[in-house]
Amino acid sequence: MSNSNNNNNNKKLAISLKNVCRGYGNTKVIDNLNLQIKSGTINCLIGASGSGKTTILRTILGRLIPDSGEVLVFGKRPHDIGGVPGSICGFCPQEGALYYDLTLDHTLNFFSNVHQIPKDKFESKKNEIIKLLDLPQINSRSVGLLSGGQKKRVSLAVALLHSPKLLILDEPTVGIDMEVASNIWSYLRSLANSGVTIIITTHYINEAVGSDNVFLLRDGKILENGAPNYLIERYESQTLEEVFLKLCKRDNAQSIVDSKKNNNNSYFSSQEIIDVESHIVNNNNNNNNNNNNNNYNNNDDEENYNDDIYNDKKPLIGISKEDENNTNGSTNKESGILFRFYKVLLHSVAIGKRKFIQIIRNKVVLSFELLSPSVQVLLYFLAIGGSPKNLEFGVVNLDVGPIGSMYINSLSNTGIFNFHNYNSTTEAIEQIKSGNSFGLLDINAQFSEAILENFMNLSQYNPNGQIDLYMDFTNYQITLIVEQQLALSFETLAKQQANITMNPIKTVTPTVYGNPNSKFIDFLAPGMVCLISFAHAISITSVSFVKEKVDGSLDRLFAYGVRTSSIVFGHFLGHLPLLLVQITVLLLIAIYGFNVPIEGNIALVFLMTVSLAFVGMSLGLVISAVSRVETEAIQLSLGVYFPTLICSGTLWPLQSLPNWFVWFPNILPATHAGNAMRDIMLKGVGLHYKEVWVAFLVVLSWLIFLIFIAVLALNEKDKNLKLSCFKKRK
């Protein structure tokens, strides 16, 4: 025992927490905590749920900033260059934090890319870890199909892969076979002997006997710490569990005294309080006497803080020995803008590749991403914008001349009407009331004679020269089309039979823009193509971060120093190939499947569609970053999409809006994109046209703004951290 203690005393401090306090709201989780851990040791944090174990780990990793106090990891504060978070740390969270769509090989390859491990070194390390942890060799099997114990071992493999100097394991042996657990502890001991500092949290108290030090936690404070055998001997116990029980009882007794001193309404006698106090004093005296032999010499350890601590261990993966031998040079290199940009780029590519593999392996998601936009545009062109056909219409034709019948025949040839002859107006109106007919044309007996008189004698009007129309006017679109066709057919008939032009307006050809015979679908198509790509881009990214936040995957990436910008750009890269395929197929269906005219540059059409889809992706990432569960993300996506659909001018001209509301559609990216698409496709204009270049400018501005918000929202947990660090360093 004495030799072990002497060895520990010769080691340098790896972690130091001084007077650290951290709470959530008004609740303090850890209060005035002091903790020192020496390098090359195995340390167990033991405590019930809510005792502060996870908060301590997150504080050490730099994910939480203490409300007060100081945290040093290898002599550096969290987020200092070359410290935590970063590849110096290996982290195995309790949740597992794995990507269940990936295989074991894909998982380890992804994290090797994150840590920039050389390929030859990665292969040897991978084989070593697979053998150690008895991991399955089935490369085609997803991690999600493994048992709970196997998943835990995969998570542990990820933490060990890059040979970190600091290893933080949250419940690493839960659900693992006893033999494998024993092998893991033996391996951890060999790592500690080589200089790796290991922190373990566990509920299995007796399992901590194999560690160098245990920290017994309760209600955010350390009840006791020291070597396991020493604590067992000191408290005259058989097991650590018994030691913990005695300490909890002592803590309860102390709490009683403290509460009674602060409470005038005593429910205990003075003698009871004196007895409890004397018991606590005796225990505390024993603790003070023994701590002189067991606790670290903090003053000496603090003097040992220097950069040499980084030189007496194995080199970090991906950093050359030359860099490691010159810590200042390494620090200067890592602090350079080009190096940081290069690191962000590498992480983005790694995350993008991982995301793409996840999509490819998930057949449901892949089918949705490939087929959904195509199905939507097909349904749109089939269901919207066409003219109604075979409308049930009644006719009461009492005209003794030929014009009434000629007019009905002209209407029948349009294909819009399916006429039924009735003998009486009352009978035909009843069919409208019963829903069997949309309307009725009632032609009186003198119609032909009267209409000719009206043409010949303009000074006298004969009311018999008109046809009475009865209709169900509740369907606005059908009413509009019917009235338009009734007028158009009569104009055509008058011109054919009497060479009379009823409409004094002449359309001059060639037109300035467009085709006078264009259909409503031609007006809708450009905007709908934009909106479908925009909406689908939102849907595929709006849940991207939610699951990763819940299962701890994001926390693991943050612990390894991956920036939020890398995560956001990585998701862009992962979805980009499929997004380009989707938009290509969507435009091909519109142009060649339904003959939507494109008078302008097809490249501009494609670029505008892709740009708006990028805005949709970035908006989806914002939604994902602020959502706690997937249902929230879905609801927010719908809440964003429908106002955009309604107010973008796709379904109805913006000129119809009230003046006080015009500002809202004009700030939406889909509004400008839809108008620009319509101008390019129907007018044939290019970037010189104001509406087109303004649209590109607005869409680009929205893209930059939303990416910034996505990074900020995803990084919200670190906001107070950076402000606090800034204040401290001022």
Curated annotation (Swiss-Prot):
Keywords attached to this Swiss-Prot or TrEMBL record, sorted alphabetically, are: ATP-binding, Membrane, Nucleotide-binding, Transmembrane, Transmembrane helix, Transport
Residues covered by region (Disordered)? 281-303
Membrane spanning stretches: 520-540, 572-592, 602-622, 634-654, 692-712
Looking up SUPFAM superfamilies in the UniProt record yields: P-loop containing nucleoside triphosphate hydrolases (SSF52540)
Q: Name one GO biological process term.
A: sorocarp development
Q: How does it sit in the membrane?
A: Multi-pass membrane protein
Q: Which Pfam families match?
A: ABC2_membrane_3 (PF12698), ABC_tran (PF00005)
The UniProt similarity line reads: Belongs to the ABC transporter superfamily.
Please report the name of this protein according to its UniProt entry: ABC transporter G family member 20
Record organism: Dictyostelium discoideum (Social amoeba)
